[in-house]
Amino acid sequence: MRHPSRAAKALLAAAVLPLALTACSSATGTSASSATAKKPSKDPNAGLLTGAQLKKALAPASFFAAGFAVDPSAARNSGTTYTAPSSSPAAKPDCTLLGGTSWISITGDSGVSFAQNDYISKATSEDIAQEIDTFRGTTAAQVMANLKKAVAACATYTDADTHTKVKVVGADTTGLGDAAYTITLTNSAWQNGSTLIAARSGTDVVTVLSTDGHDNGAATAKKLTARIVTSLKAEHEHA
């Protein structure tokens, strides 16, 4: 039997080595890829409250003065599931949105969950609305920034009922959550103005509207906002 020369053996060994290394590398790469594929992606909604949980943080009927009753048609929440968020701030905001409940929609941002309701006095028609919206990541802070931009573009707007000008004044507010912003709406044709407050608490944005009292609704709006922010912290602790 003919045996290969030493030179031939050396060449054969040199040829086999790269193949072995390639096979080893290939196996290692496949293993790493498999490990990566098996690693679950992080839930973007982890730690966020659902609409059903946010509902519990809204102020109860006992918070409101005698004569106020919830408006069933305005009480809603997103339930136990999350919705896809979106952001589409308008170049020119619809300033009339400040005149109603869910006024935070003026920012063009929508979160993954929400809860809201509205209490009205049948005797005086005074209105107190409350809402909580939850956002992913740092979006809540951006919502607050977008709100300020929108208000800056809305010095006045025309009231649909009286066809008169509504004056809009916004200002940063301390002592409510991580950041807060107060908007005051006044109109000479109204008996009383409105106070809107937006307060960020972590990933949640609390918004209220009040026409209660003789101070443009300011005292009630601040008291309600503080109540909701405190309740939200408790809900997160229990979640």
What are these regions (language model features)?
Residues 129-131, 203-212:
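Short, well-ordered beta-strand elements
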Residues 193-204:
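Extended hydrophobic
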Residues 68-192, 218, 224, 232, ...:
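A small/polar (G/S/T-enriched), proline-flanked helix-loop surface module common
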Residues 6-7, 20-40:
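Bacterial lipoprotein signal-peptidase II cleavage site
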Residues 1-12:
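Bacterial N-terminal signal peptides that target proteins for export
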Residues 12-17, 21:
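Hydrophobic helical h-region of N-terminal Sec-dependent signal peptides
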Residues 33-57:
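Post-signal peptide N-terminal segment of mature Sec-exported envelope proteins
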Residues 208-224:
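A short acidic/glycine-rich loop-to-helix N-cap element
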